[in-house]
């Protein structure tokens, strides 16, 4: 996996069966995001520059909540063939893009964090790397620093 590789996903067809099972309206959205593997910590994958492009041909898309859309994004990430040694996946948001709160288990105990607030990162060339406490009863974000 190369740094700054861009993946484009359309969930409207990929998760059609899952959508029908949940009896929910289709999520017609394309996700654009970049993936970077930390050089200092190979067990960490950073996902950044997340953007959502809703299909103009889907009338129901305007009613889809961001939480639902990012739920399907997390499902897709769990299906990517990422080495099982990678335990921490962080989804970061820039100040111009706000992500609702949602947490999903990932692979062998890693976590996907959707921030409830905008990250204090104004430079679009940077993202925030969050340190997670494994010893706490609940996984908690201890500190964030710029990469």
Curated annotation (Swiss-Prot):
Top-level lineage group: Eukaryota
Transmembrane segments: 69-89
Membrane association type: Single-pass membrane protein
Main subcellular location: membrane
Record keyword Transmembrane present: yes
Listed GO CC annotations: membrane
Keywords: Membrane, Transmembrane, Transmembrane helix
Subcellular location: Membrane
Protein name from the UniProt record: Putative uncharacterized protein YOR392W
Organism listed in the record: Saccharomyces cerevisiae (strain ATCC 204508 / S288c) (Baker's yeast)
Taxonomic lineage: Eukaryota, Fungi, Dikarya, Ascomycota, Saccharomycotina
């Amino acid at each position: 996996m190369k740094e700054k590789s861009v993946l484009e996903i359309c969930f409207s067809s990929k998760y059609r069966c899952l959508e029908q099972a949940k009896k929910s309206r289709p999520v017609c959205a394309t996700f654009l995001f970049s993936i970077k593997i930390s050089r200092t910590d190979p067990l960490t994958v950073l996902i950044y520059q997340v953007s959502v492009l809703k299909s103009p041909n889907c009338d129901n898309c305007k009613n889809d909540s961001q939480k639902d859309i990012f739920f399907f994004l997390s499902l897709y990430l769990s299906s990517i063939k990422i080495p099982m040694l990678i335990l921490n996946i962080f989804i970061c948001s820039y100040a111009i893009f706000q992500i609702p709160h949602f947490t999903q288990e990932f692979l062998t105990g890693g976590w996907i964090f959707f921030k409830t607030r905008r990250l204090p990162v104004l430079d679009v060339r940077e993202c925030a790397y969050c340190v997670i406490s494994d010893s706490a009863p609940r996984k908690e974000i201890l500190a964030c620093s710029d990469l």
